[in-house]
A protein has these predicted regions:
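Extracellular/periplasmic bilobed ligand-binding domains
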Residues: 210
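Feature captures the catalytic cores and cofactor-binding loops of soluble hydro-lyases/lyases
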Residues: 29, 34-38, 196-199
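Histidine-rich, glycine-flanked metal-binding segment
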Residues: 1-16
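Polyanionic/metal-chelating signatures
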Residues: 59-207
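Protease-associated
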Residues: 16-17, 29, 176
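Divalent metal-coordination and catalytic microenvironments
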Residues: 12, 23, 58, 197
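Histidine-centered catalytic micro-motifs
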Residues: 20-28
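Proteins synthesized as precursors that undergo proteolytic processing into mature forms
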Residues: 33-56, 60
Length: 210
C-alpha cells in the first residue's frame, strides 16, 4: 500500500461492511421548509454542511453513507441528498452521484400541525382529509404539467411563434415521481393514512420507496 495509508492488522477481528443510514438529517441544519404544504422544489444538497462534527462521529461508529432527508413538517417536502461520509471534504464531494433521486413526504400529526399551538395552526391542511387532498391536487397539477411538456417536446415546431410551457421546479420534481425517476420516502403514523397514500399512488400510477 502507499506509504501514507494506515495499515491495520485485522487478525482475530470482526470486519463488517460500512453501515448505511437510510433516514438521516446529519450535515443539514435547515431541514424544514414548512411555510407551505408543498415544497418539492427545495433541495437538501444546497445546504449540506461538510464541517458538521456529526460526520466525524458517525464515521467512528462505522457509518459510511447516509440518505439526508428534508424534515416532515409538510405533506410534500424537499428533495433528498445521498452522501458518502468524507470528513474534511467539500459539500459537493459528499454527494453520491449514482443514487436514485428521492423526496420526502409526510403524513399525520406533523403535517396537520397537531399540538403546535393555536398561533401556529394557520396552514392548510389541519386534518388527515386535507393531507389526502393536498396530494391529489398536487399530482393532478403534475399530470397536466407533464402533458404540456410532452406535447411541446413531441412537436416543438408548432411552438415557434408561441412561448414554451413555463418551467415549474415544484411540478418538475412531482413529474419525476410519476415517471419513476424519483423515489418517495414517507414519514407516517397510522395504518389508515398509509392506506390513503397507497390509494393515491395507485390512482396516479406512482410507487412509494419507503
Amino acid at each position: 500500500p502507499p506509504k501514507d495509508v494506515m495499515v491495520i492488522d485485522g487478525t482475530g477481528k470482526h470486519i463488517t461492511p460500512g453501515l448505511i443510514d437510510c433516514h438521516s438529517h446529519s450535515a443539514a441544519f435547515s431541514i424544514n421548509e414548512g411555510t407551505q404544504s408543498i415544497t418539492a422544489e427545495v433541495r437538501i444538497q444546497d445546504v449540506l454542511n461538510s464541517n458538521d462534527i456529526t460526520i466525524y462521529r458517525e464515521l467512528a461508529g462505522g457509518l459510511t453513507m447516509a440518505n439526508i432527508l428534508h424534515g416532515s413538517a409538510n405533506t410534500i417536502g424537499g428533495q433528498n441528498a445521498v452522501i458518502k461520509l468524507r470528513w474534511g471534504a467539500t459539500p459537493d464531494a459528499l454527494l453520491y452521484s449514482n443514487a436514485v433521486k428521492g423526496i420526502k413526504f409526510a403524513l399525520g400529526e406533523n403535517v396537520k400541525q397537531s399540538n403546535w399551538g393555536d398561533d401556529n395552526t394557520t396552514r392548510y391542511p389541519q386534518t388527515r382529509m386535507g393531507v389526502e387532498q393536498i396530494l391529489r391536487d398536487a399530482f393532478t397539477s403534475a399530470v397536466e404539467y407533464q402533458k404540456k411538456w410532452s406535447g411541446y417536446n413531441k412537436n416543438p415546431k408548432q411552438w415557434k411563434k408561441k412561448v414554451p410551457p413555463r418551467r415549474d421546479l415544484e411540478l418538475e420534481a412531482l413529474v419525476e415521481i410519476l415517471e419513476g425517476q424519483r423515489q418517495i420516502h414517507c414519514h407516517s403514523y397510522r395504518q389508515d393514512e398509509i392506506l390513503m397514500l397507497t390509494r393515491v399512488s395507485e390512482d396516479f400510477g406512482f410507487t412509494v420507496g419507503t
